[in-house]
Amino acid sequence: MGKQVNVGNVVFGSDSLPLIAGPCVIESLDHSLKMAESIKTITEKIGMPFIFKSSFDKANRTSMDSFRGPNMDKGLAILSAVKSEVGIPVLTDVHLPDQCLSVSQVADVLQIPAFLCRQTDLLIAAGKTGTPVNIKKGQFLSPEKMKHAAEKIATTANQNILLTERGTSFGYGLISDMTSISIMQ
């Protein structure tokens, strides 16, 4: 896409490299606050913009026995607290179209998980919120195919679209091909 996307005071563009980081899944308010504060301290020291990322539901876990997260209501309350107490933008995954509007009331960025990056209804629902959307490239897609995911969101008049290189599957391994970034721009 090769353009600038603003998320609060964080700018994504050709001259900046913001960090999206945090625990994969929300464990507790205390843990989330501690992680956000620690990462913020480090990124401020090196002058790197930072968005806190954590998920209220990891719906794509391999095992049914794995911890999925606190649920949407509790997770959004925790993300809201992180956002206000630490003073940073927050990002979280959405898995279903009917989650997008509620999540956009708290999250500064809606993230589409890699395995859901071609789900038209989800992409359109996320785009319709007007909130910036980060689409993780599916391991099964070439970077050229990501333009179709971005175009689905763009049909909603939301131009605040970010694409994240997630890697490519080679057998059972996952390899990140950094040349994909320039193609997806």
Residue ranges, per PLM feature:
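Catalytic beta/alpha-barrel core
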Residues: P70-N71, E85-Q99, D108-D121, P132-P143, ...
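Generic structural signal for well-ordered alpha-helices
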Residues: L33-K40, L76-S80, C100, L123, ...
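Short, well-ordered coil/turn segments that N-cap beta-strands
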Residues: S14-L17, I46-F50, S84-V90, V106-D108, ...
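N-terminal amphipathic alpha-helix/helix-capping segment at the start of soluble metabolic enzymes
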Residues: M1-L19, A77
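Glycine-rich, proline-tolerant flexible connector loops at the mouths of alpha/beta enzymes
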Residues: P23-S32, F50-M72
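Conserved, mostly hydrophobic/aromatic
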Residues: G22, F52, V103, I135, ...
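Alpha-helix-loop-beta-strand connector modules within alpha/beta enzyme cores
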Residues: S38-I46, D65-L91, A126-P132, S182-Q185
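Catalytic alpha/beta core domains of metabolic enzymes, predominantly
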Residues: G130, N134-Q185
